C-alpha cells in the first residue's frame, strides 16, 4: 500500500512484531506510530526483508524492545534485511532497545537512508548499524539528523558502510518523553537545513530549553574590601533588547 497511516502499538512476538514486508512488495507509510512493541529476538517495531521496499515519512518509532530472550539480536526499531531498501524521512526513533542497532539495523546486502530525523536515547551498543551477513555488506546514509553520540552512535562492520552528512549530536529537547510526547521545544536546535523541525512531530512546547550562557570575563576590583566582582556574559537565548526579567543564566 502507498499512503498508509498506521498505529501499531503494544504487540509482542518472536520477531518482525509490529510490521513486516517480505518479498517483492512496496509500501509508503506516512504519519504513523510504532510504539511499545516487544520482540524476543529482532525487529520489534518491524522489518523489511527479501527485496522489499519501504518509504516511511513522519513516523514515530518509540519504546520498542528487541532481544528480550537475552541473545545478541538487533533492531528494537526497524530492520532492513536481505536485499531490501528503506527510506526514513523526518522520523523520530526514541527509547528503542536491542543489543545493537537499537533504532535501525541494515543488513545482508540492504540499503537505507535516514534524513531529517531524530535518533535519541536508544539503549544498546549503537543506535544505527549496517552489517554483513553471509558476506553481503550493507549501506546506510544519514543526512541532516540528530544522532545521539554522533559518529560513535553508529556502527558499520568491515563489509558495510555508513555515509553521513549534516550530523548533529545534541539534545533535541523532547517536550514530555516520559509521557510519550516526542514533539520538540520551539527553541530546539534540531532544525533541518530547509528550516523545518527534525523528526516526526514538529514543535509541541516551549520552556524546556535552559541554555547556559558562557562567561566572557571575570574582573575583581582590587582594594574594594571584597565588595564587588564584575562578571560579563555573552547574550543568552532568552535575552531581550529592552529591560525585563526574562534573562536566565546558569552559573
Indicate residue ranges for each PLM-predicted region.
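Short intrinsically disordered, low-complexity coil segments enriched in acidic
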Residues: 1-10, 209-215
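Predominantly extracellular beta-rich ligand-binding scaffolds that present long acidic/polar faces
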Residues: 5-9, 15, 20-181
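Short secondary-structure junctions and interdomain/linker hinges
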Residues: 63, 196-198, 225
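A broad, structural micro-motif
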Residues: 140, 184-185, 213, 246
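C-terminal accessory segments
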Residues: 164-206
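Pro/Thr/Ser/Gly-rich low-complexity, intrinsically disordered linker/stalk tracts
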Residues: 208-245
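Beta-strand signatures of extracellular beta-sandwich domains
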Residues: 248-250
Amino acid at each position: 500500500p502507498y499512503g498508509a497511516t498506521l498505529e501499531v502499538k503494544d504487540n509482542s512476538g518472536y520477531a518482525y512484531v509490529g510490521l513486516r514486508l517480505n518479498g517483492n512488495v512496496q509500501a509508503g507509510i506516512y504519519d504513523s506510530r510504532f510504539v511499545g512493541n516487544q520482540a524476543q529476538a529482532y525487529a520489534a517495531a518491524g522489518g523489511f526483508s527479501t527485496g522489499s521496499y519501504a518509504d516511511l515519512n513522519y513516523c514515530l518509532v518509540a519504546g520498542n524492545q528487541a532481544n528480550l530472550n537475552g541473545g545478541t539480536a538487533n533492531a528494537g526499531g526497524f530492520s532492513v534485511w536481505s536485499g531490501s531498501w528503506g527510506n526514513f524521512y523526518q522520523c523520530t526513533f526514541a527509547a528503542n532497545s536491542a543489543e545493537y542497532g537499537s533504532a535501525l539495523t541494515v543488513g545482508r546486502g540492504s540499503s537505507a537512508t535516514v534524513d531529517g530525523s531524530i535518533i535519541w536515547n536508544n539503549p544498546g551498543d549503537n543506535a544505527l548499524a549496517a552489517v554483513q551477513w553471509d558476506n553481503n555488506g550493507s549501506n546506510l546514509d544519514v543526512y541532516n539528523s540528530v544522532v545521539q553520540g554522533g559518529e560513535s552512535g553508529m556502527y558499520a562492520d568491515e563489509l558495510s558502510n555508513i555515509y553521513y552528512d549534516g550530523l548533529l549530536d545534541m539534545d533535541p529537547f523532547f517536550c514530555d518523553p516520559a509521557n510519550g510526547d516526542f514533539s520538540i521545544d520551539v527553541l530546539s536546535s534540531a532544525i533541518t537545513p530547509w528550516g523545518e523541525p527534525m523528526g516526526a512531530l514538529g514543535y509541541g512546547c516551549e520552556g524546556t530549553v535552559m541554555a547556559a550562557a558562557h562567561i566572557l570575563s571575570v574582573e575583581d576590583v582590587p582594594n574594594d574590601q571584597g565588595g564587588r566582582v564584575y562578571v560579563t556574559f555573552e547574550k543568552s537565548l532568552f535575552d531581550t533588547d529592552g529591560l525585563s526579567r526574562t534573562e536566565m543564566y546558569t552559573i
